[in-house]
């Protein structure tokens, strides 16, 4: 049983920070993750405050094992557990897709560095606090996040809501509520039943006519790989300029 997950500084699970500060018990699944914030270290006796290089001293990087899954499967591992509590549907879909592809690649003999690099790039595009190997490969010291929040290379920007889906032709109608969409944009559609649909726009139609772009206030249609529902939310995926890229 091997994990792909966000790591907690309370390895035993006995953490009371969230309960003490926010009245939300981590041990009952309600952790507010205030350990992820920046903290200073102060000696209460001498009133001396330590100047530390990284303020996020209680926020470990996320565990990622996909690049050495072949070694673990060689060793006999047969169950990989993926944790996604408090993560968006796009995180759940993309991470499970990558790890499933890795297992299949190992089984059919096509697991290689090129595929690992592609999986790594995709995993960096959704919520993460940077990645490390855990202690699987002999590392003795932990690695810690260098910023608060996500280090994802992409962000989702809400632009439209679902109106109708035409099953026979696989086309969905949406209404733009902000921003714009262009042919070639990468999009994410989410909903309670739909889950997460991710694809690149190949064609946009407004009043049944092909257009290069649609803007706020317009109704438009496009081919969608899976069924969507009214009130589903459509996001445009945009690249994030990170001040510091997580390793």
What role is predicted for each listed range?
Residues 85-161:
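Anionic-ligand-binding alpha/beta catalytic cores of soluble enzymes and soluble regulatory domains
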Residues 82:
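Extended, alpha-helix-rich binding/interface surfaces that flank or overlap catalytic cores
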Residues 146, 152-247:
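Beta-strand/loop-dominated core regions that host nucleotide or nucleotide-derived cofactor-binding catalytic loops
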Residues 2-3:
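Short, small-residue-biased leader/transition segments that mark boundaries at the very start
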Residues 26, 30, 63-67, 75, ...:
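Conserved active-site and cofactor/substrate-binding residues in soluble primary-metabolism enzymes
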Residues 10, 17, 64-78, 94-98:
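Catalytic cores of alpha/beta
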Residues 11-54:
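Glycine-rich, positively charged active-site loop/lid region within alpha/beta enzyme cores that binds
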Residues 51-64:
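Active-site mouth loops of central-metabolism enzymes
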């Amino acid at each position: 049983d091997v994990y792909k997950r966000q790591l907690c500084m309370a390895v035993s699970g006995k953490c009371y920070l969230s309960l003490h500060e926010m009245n939300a018990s981590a041990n009952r699944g309600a952790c507010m993750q205030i350990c992820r914030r920046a903290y200073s270290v102060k000696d209460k006796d001498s009133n001396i405050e330590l100047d530390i290089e990284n303020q996020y001293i209680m926020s470990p990087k996320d565990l990622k094992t996909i690049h050495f899954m072949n070694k673990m499967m060689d060793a006999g591992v047969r169950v990989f557990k993926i944790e996604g509590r408090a993560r968006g549907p796009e995180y759940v879909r993309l991470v499970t897709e990558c790890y499933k592809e890795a297992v299949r690649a190992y089984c059919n003999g096509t697991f290689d560095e090129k595929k690992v690099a592609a999986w790594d790039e995709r995993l960096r595009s959704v919520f993460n606090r940077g990645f490390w190997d855990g202690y699987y490969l002999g590392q003795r010291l932990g690695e810690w996040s260098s910023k608060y929040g996500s280090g994802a290379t992409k962000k989702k920007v809400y632009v439209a809501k679902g109106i109708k889906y035409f099953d026979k032709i696989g086309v969905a109608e949406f209404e733009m509520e902000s921003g714009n969409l262009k042919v070639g944009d990468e999009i994410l559609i989410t909903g309670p039943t739909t889950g997460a649909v991710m694809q690149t726009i190949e064609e946009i139609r407004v009043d049944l006519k092909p257009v290069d772009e649609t803007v706020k206030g317009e109704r438009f249609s496009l081919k969608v790989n899976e069924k969507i529902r009214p009130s589903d939310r459509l996001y445009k995926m945009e690249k994030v300029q990170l001040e510091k890229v997580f390793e």
